């Protein structure tokens, strides 16, 4: 950006010359983390919804959501082609449920990690979270299950501090809680 902070404060229009489209969008939208108040404890007897979304998957050419489906969110911000990975006998060329789950898990864990770090006065400018999700055979019922491994890189933190931060994050991250204790899931026929 070529406009100084003082000029911006005075009302000058910013110039986005030399920035990538992603950087430009981030600056235009003033992306910022959620408030630290997200960590305030809720006191109540029932689940209190804060945000809800719906994604619809249609079957596509093969009439099979996993093999040729399209996933669309109700707000239009997500539209993805779903394809069976080559490793499972499909053509690849699209995303799949495991990648979407891994992306959600990694993003949620990263967000919770940063909220806790901010509350503790720790800057995590270079933190990364990898979620490795594996689809495989379940020895319990002979069908299928998922296994997730979350790997966190906190290169600038002392090991003891990093380990404590990760332990605390695992306690509060909604995806980690879901993996550990299950989730309320209602399956219903609508038509």
Predicted segments, located by residue:
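Extended beta-strand/beta-hairpin segments
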Residues: 2-103, 110-191
């Amino acid at each position: 950006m070529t406009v100084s902070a003082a000029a911006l404060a005075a009302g000058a229009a910013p110039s986005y010359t030399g920035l990538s489209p992603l950087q430009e969008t981030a600056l235009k939208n003033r992306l910022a983390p959620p408030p630290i108040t997200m960590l305030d404890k809720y006191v109540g007897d029932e689940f209190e919804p804060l945000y809800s979304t719906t994604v619809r998957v249609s079957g596509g050419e093969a009439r099979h959501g996993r093999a040729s489906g399209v996933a669309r969110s109700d707000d239009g911000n997500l539209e993805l082609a779903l394809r069976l990975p080559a490793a499972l006998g499909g053509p690849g060329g699209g995303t799949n449920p495991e990648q979407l789950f891994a992306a959600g898990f990694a993003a949620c864990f990263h967000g919770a990690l940063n909220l806790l770090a901010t509350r503790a006065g720790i800057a995590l400018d270079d933190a990364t979270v990898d979620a490795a999700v594996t689809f495989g055979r379940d020895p319990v019922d002979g069908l299928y299950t998922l296994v997730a491994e979350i790997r966190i890189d906190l290169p600038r933190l002392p090991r003891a501090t990093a380990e404590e931060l990760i332990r605390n994050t695992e306690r509060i991250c909604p995806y980690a809680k879901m993996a550990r204790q299950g989730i309320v899931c209602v399956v219903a026929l609508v038509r």
